[in-house]
Amino acid sequence: MIRTRIKFCGITRATDAQSACALGVDALGFVFTRRSARFVEPATANAIRRDLPPFVSAVALFMDDDPAWIAHVVSIVAPDLVQFHGSEAALDCARVGRPWIKAVAMASHEDVASYAARYAGASGFLLDAHAVGEQGGSGRRFDWSRVPALDRPVILAGGLDAGNVAEAIVRARPYAVDVSSGIESAPGIKDVARMRDFIAAVKG
């Protein structure tokens, strides 16, 4: 059985990152879109990133941000992976010069395979419940039966928590799951018990 990878997104505090790593998370997401409630300054993210143990990936999230800002953040944080959550064109994504994944707004895109075909350079696709122009981390979910078979890894997001992630994995068979609000006590503030329960549910 293939192991389902786990990404905790919206990390803003070193203590949350350390707890997540101790629990066995595979990747941590840092949001660099200023309008997000989970925005983190690049210097703060860099300090957290420097203390990550081996084999825990740092993911930088952007949503229709200015290319100069993206380049600035990448130069400071040096993320392992960049996640584009908006309406960025494939050329804009590739310009960052690092491996990248593209979010798919499932509330707006019916033909996911056709949308994904426009992003041939993506390392994978993150399927989230939001509509185009909306941010992730809303706690909403979508119909998991809509997850298509793609030629690259699929990361499942949107409304996941310890109570439903096992069912989501069984139904959608994603490469990875991504959670933010489902492990929080407030936006950007992670809850250790919820993190622990989420990882236990995935591994179980």
Label each PLM-derived region with a short phrase.
Residues 1-204:
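Conserved N-terminal beta1-alpha1 strand-loop-helix module at the mouth
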